[in-house]
Amino acid sequence: MKPQFRNTVERMYRGTFFYSFNNRPILSRRNTVWLCYEVKTRGPSMPTWGTKIFRGQVYSKAKYHPEMRFLRWFSKWRQLHHDQEYKVTWYVSWSPCTRCANSVATFLAKDPKVTLTIFVARLYYFWKPDYQQALRILCQKRGGPHATMKIMNYNEFQDCWNKFVDGRGKPFKPRNNLPKHYTLLQATLGELLRHLMDPGTFTSNFNNKPWVSGQHETYLCYKVERLHNDTWVPLNQHRGFLRNQAPNIHGFPKGRHAELCFLDLIPFWKLDGQQYRVTCFTSWSPCFSCAQEMAKFISNNEHVSLCIFAARIYDDQGRYQEGLRTLHRDGAKIAMMNYSEFEYCWDTFVDRQGRPFQPWDGLDEHSQALSERLRAILQNQGN
């Protein structure tokens, strides 16, 4: 027997979905929180046990928030079915507030047979330290039960539309800025949760062997520092990594390079007029177009200095050399990564599990050769 549902609706109107699940990072007057959930019993076939929608108000008491309503309802059901394992998926218009995040973390710690994946359209008060800490506790992976939180991309919006919206047979049509907003929110969530890169991903993509092939992705690790009393002070809240967005039909039709995604992110930090230093560690040096855009950025933001350390030189047989020279001329520091930069990235951005950085054969030789090649490019030698 399934429990009785309260404070739920079966389907959402199309207009309500587009209004409430708009993924623009900063929005006002979105006071209703929608939580669409799917519960499956864990097993070989993973049958769906229930799909419903809870809703609540942002500024009401926490007990009326949809996350708390779900926990009360589901806890009653678990008392009668405590031996069953469940996989729970949420699609929420706002990520949980501090009290809800703490309550969900407590629930998961007490019931390890329940796994929870949370897809969020927007981040709620992500700039507040107490909120950041609550989400880190909820999603921490220190051997205990935890939630997995992700930003909704096109596929999740489409799934939510198909399962929970009264679409009247019409397909989901994304907003034009959905992929750009997704990139911003994904990077922000990575900063907030302090995501780390898989070791294999790092060694594969940052390997500086000159004969590397098949590496079509670009990874960009970044850190930000502020000048205070003649000392550069790290801003650890703005530290993370991202990668290029591959071309696809429903997101970026032409793709978007990692450098452009990074430039999209910087205004989101709302840096003031103090002096800042942004350092990027990239698996490939910028292409001509990205170099031009980065040059424009530092020209328009004189209080921000830019340092770029690249593992390899991106050679598209086009105007990449001109782009690098323009970027260098406009004030950016450009250099090839050497052992120190590789080790720093490994220690800072990689989920290394306590393992020290192990250089590959020829790292120093490749770095030296690439540095000589970059020097010749920047000095316009042989061109």
Curated annotation (Swiss-Prot):
PROSITE patterns: CYT_DCMP_DEAMINASES_1, CYT_DCMP_DEAMINASES_2. GO terms for molecular function: cytidine deaminase activity; RNA binding; zinc ion binding. Residues 29-138, 214-327 form the CMP/dCMP-type deaminase domain. Residues 209-335 are annotated as: Necessary for homooligomerization. Residues 1-60 are annotated as: Essential for cytoplasmic localization. The keyword Methyltransferase does not apply. It is found in: Cytoplasm; Nucleus; Cytoplasm, P-body. GO terms for biological process: cytidine deamination; cytidine to uridine editing; defense response to virus; DNA cytosine deamination; innate immune response; negative regulation of single stranded viral RNA replication via double stranded DNA intermediate; transposable element silencing. Keywords: Antiviral defense, Cytoplasm, Hydrolase, Immunity, Innate immunity, Metal-binding, Nucleus, Phosphoprotein, Repeat, Zinc. The record marks N244 as: Interaction with DNA. The modification Phosphothreonine is found at T32, T218. The CMP/dCMP deaminase domain 1 mediates RNA binding, RNA-dependent oligomerization and virion incorporation whereas the CMP/dCMP deaminase domain 2 confers deoxycytidine deaminase activity and substrate sequence specificity. This is DNA dC->dU-editing enzyme APOBEC-3G. The lineage of its organism: Eukaryota, Metazoa, Chordata, Craniata, Vertebrata.
